[in-house]
């Protein structure tokens, strides 16, 4: 590890292979916590490259719980977190809208790291059993159309690093790579990131991971979601080509909403917001979810245009299908799935 630390101190980038090996060392129980913390802070200070991100993703996926290869057509819409905006759980709420629109959603997530309420905290509050095994997740994806993958359970080797991340209390490369380490072999992906300069590197990693289509967004105000506040910077991966562009919410009929207007709270408060959105209540929360779910449906290919995606998202909510997916997941995730274990 000392060689890698020395390179980072000198501001040098690591190669993909060096980062892969460093990643395996980070997961080694014999490495000191102080070395892990130093590595993460130095890497953040230097700035992460696409090669470094992909190298670490390789190491983490190698050490993750194994999943069957026959899960086909799944999507994730997990964001990086780390934007400090304390918004409600936009991507988790949107996940049920996607599922209601017929997308198979493998939602990768965690408890709160830099926010008040993480996706796991919200889902637990809503009554979802977040401790599903790979076999149970496979079953849920097939029969419910949505499953939650609790990151610490999927990546047991990350237990120590989670503790260190919490103590550091600053975004690290692990915020960036969270959405990239989903152990399910995803076909498409929608990723919100908090660092605008990482849009292209993250899209390049998604390309290396074999995604057929993907959309990476940095929202107005550096939100790790698409924002109704103003211009959103976007990178689209389609047909193995990467295109950079920007998206204005007004073009799609939305009124401007400041990021402060969509702040969330604790898990109880955020659960109330999510249930309100999925029940069809008109609000700035609903509009934010429609925008994000619409973009995700476009990224998935379910919608040919963003406009069509927003229309499909609205239908998913207003038809009751999105809320039905939540209720199905609550029921199915709490069953004794002995037949699949």
From Swiss-Prot:
One of its GO terms (molecular function) is anthranilate phosphoribosyltransferase activity. Homodimer. It comes from Bacillus thuringiensis subsp. konkukian (strain 97-27). HAMAP family: TrpD (MF_00211). Binds 2 magnesium ions per monomer. GO terms for biological process: L-tryptophan biosynthetic process. GO terms for cellular component: cytosol. This is Anthranilate phosphoribosyltransferase. It catalyses: N-(5-phospho-beta-D-ribosyl)anthranilate + diphosphate = 5-phospho-alpha-D-ribose 1-diphosphate + anthranilate. Gene3D superfamilies: Nucleoside phosphorylase/phosphoribosyltransferase catalytic domain, Transferase, Pyrimidine Nucleoside Phosphorylase, Chain C. Its cofactor is Mg(2+). Keywords: Amino-acid biosynthesis, Aromatic amino acid biosynthesis, Glycosyltransferase, Magnesium, Metal-binding, Transferase, Tryptophan biosynthesis. It is an enzyme of class 2 (transferase). Catalyzes the transfer of the phosphoribosyl group of 5-phosphorylribose-1-pyrophosphate (PRPP) to anthranilate to yield N-(5'-phosphoribosyl)-anthranilate (PRA). Mg(2+) 1 binds at residues 91, 225. Its EC number is 2.4.2.18. Anthranilate 1 binds at residues 79, 110. Anthranilate 2 binds at residue 165. Mg(2+) 2 binds at residues 224-225. It comes from the Bacteria.
């Amino acid at each position: 590890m000392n060689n890698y630390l020395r390179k980072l101190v000198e501001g040098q980038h690591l190669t993909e292979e060096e980062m892969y090996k460093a990643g395996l060392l980070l997961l080694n129980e014999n490495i000191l916590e102080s070395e892990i913390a130093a590595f993460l802070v130095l890497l953040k200070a230097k700035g992460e490259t696409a090669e470094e991100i992909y190298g670490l993703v390789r190491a983490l996926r190698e050490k993750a719980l194994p999943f069957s290869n026959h899960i086909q057509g799944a999507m994730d819409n997990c964001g990086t977190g780390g934007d400090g905006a304390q918004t409600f759980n936009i991507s988790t709420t949107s996940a049920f809208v996607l599922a209601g629109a017929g997308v198979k959603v493998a939602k990768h997530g965690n408890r709160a790291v830099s926010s008040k309420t993480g996706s796991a905290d919200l889902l637990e509050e809503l009554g979802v059993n977040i401790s599903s095994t790979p076999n149970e997740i496979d079953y849920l994806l097939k029969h419910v159309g949505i499953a939650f993958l609790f990151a610490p359970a999927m990546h047991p080797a990350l237990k120590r690093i989670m503790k260190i991340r919490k103590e550091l209390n600053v975004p690290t490369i692990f915020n960036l790579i969270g959405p990239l380490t989903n152990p399910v072999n995803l076909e498409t992906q929608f990723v919100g990131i908090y660092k605008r300069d990482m849009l292209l590197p993250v899209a390049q990693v998604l390309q290396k991971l074999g995604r057929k289509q993907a959309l990476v967004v940095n929202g107005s105000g550096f939100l790790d979601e698409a924002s109704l506040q103003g211009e959103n910077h976007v990178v689209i991966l389609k047909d193995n080509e990467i295109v950079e562009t920007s998206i204005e919410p007004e073009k799609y009929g939305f009124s401007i909403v400041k990021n402060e207007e969509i702040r969330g709270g604790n898990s109880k408060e955020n659960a109330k917001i999510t249930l309100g959105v999925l029940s069809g209540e008109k609000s700035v929360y609903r509009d934010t979810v429609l925008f994000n779910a619409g973009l995700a449906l476009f990224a998935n290919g379910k919608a040919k245009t963003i406009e069509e995606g927003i229309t499909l998202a609205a239908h998913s909510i207003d038809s009751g299908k999105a809320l039905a997916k939540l209720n199905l997941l609550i029921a199915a995730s709490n069953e004794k799935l002995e037949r699949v274990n």
